[in-house]
Amino acid sequence: MSLFPSLPLLLLSVVATSYSETVTCEDSQKICPAVIACNSPGINGFPGKDGRDGTKGEKGEPGQGLRGLQGPPGKLGPPGNPGPSGSPGPKGQKGDPGESPDCDSSLAASERKALQTEMAHIKKWLTFSLGRQVGNKFFLTNGEMMTFDKVKALCAKFQASVATPRNAAENRAIQNLIKEEAFLGITDENTEGQFVDLIGNRLTYTNWNNGEPNNAGSDEDCVLLLKNGKWNDVPCSSSHLALCEFPI
């Protein structure tokens, strides 16, 4: 390998070294004005990494924020307990006398008479269709079959009592009214063999069938009016026609 090609490079190095030792910065600027001035600030580098969080600061003073808008009204709460009664108010002034129309006694009497007439017509209709009237008694049936206790309850509901004939005329009126055997208001529930009405009075009229009362079933404590008008003792638990009497 030849050494000659390297010789020019070696000479250039020596010249550059010697030149750099003698040329100052001011001279270099005169020689090469395009060269950047010596010791001039460089270009800013990239931002560094974030530092660590500092210590927690002291609590600041309360802020002065603006008051918000008023919210919608809430739901109604439960009603409270009633308050104590207030004291009576002052007494008012006496009012003027009222005006009362003159009572027309003749008008009242005519209306009363008309009402009585209408009630009499109603009684006649009932008598014709459903019942019989004898003296001051009105016998009525609803046509239903029931036990003696239910008959008593039914009659009491209408402020009446179970039909109890006190004479032959009343007995015959009931006989003509019924189409089925009906209970009478007579029993010997309290004392066997001693038949009385429902308020405990002894009977002053009877119309027993032949051989009756015989208490054949040992519990025949009620009385039945047969279709022939005669009486027979029967159990109160049996069901027969309901018949009531109304005082008029």
Curated annotation (Swiss-Prot):
SUPFAM superfamilies, alphabetized: C-type lectin-like, Triple coiled coil domain of C-type lectins
Stretches assigned to the C-type lectin domain: 134-245
A Gene Ontology term for the protein's cellular component: extracellular space
Posttranslational modification: Hydroxylation on proline residues within the sequence motif, GXPG, is most likely to be 4-hydroxy as this fits the requirement for 4-hydroxylation in vertebrates.
Key words, A-Z: Calcium, Coiled coil, Collagen, Complement activation lectin pathway, Complement pathway, Disulfide bond, Hydroxylation, Immunity, Innate immunity, Lectin, Mannose-binding, Repeat, Secreted, Signal
Transmembrane portions of the chain: none
The Collagen-like domain, residue ranges: 42-99
General function of this protein: Calcium-dependent lectin involved in innate immune defense. Binds mannose, fucose and N-acetylglucosamine on different microorganisms and activates the lectin complement pathway. Binds to late apoptotic cells, as well as to apoptotic blebs and to necrotic cells, but not to early apoptotic cells, facilitating their uptake by macrophages.
Domain commentary: The coiled-coil domain mediates trimerization.
Name of this protein: Mannose-binding protein C
Organism annotation: Trachypithecus obscurus
Gene name, Swiss-Prot/TrEMBL: MBL2
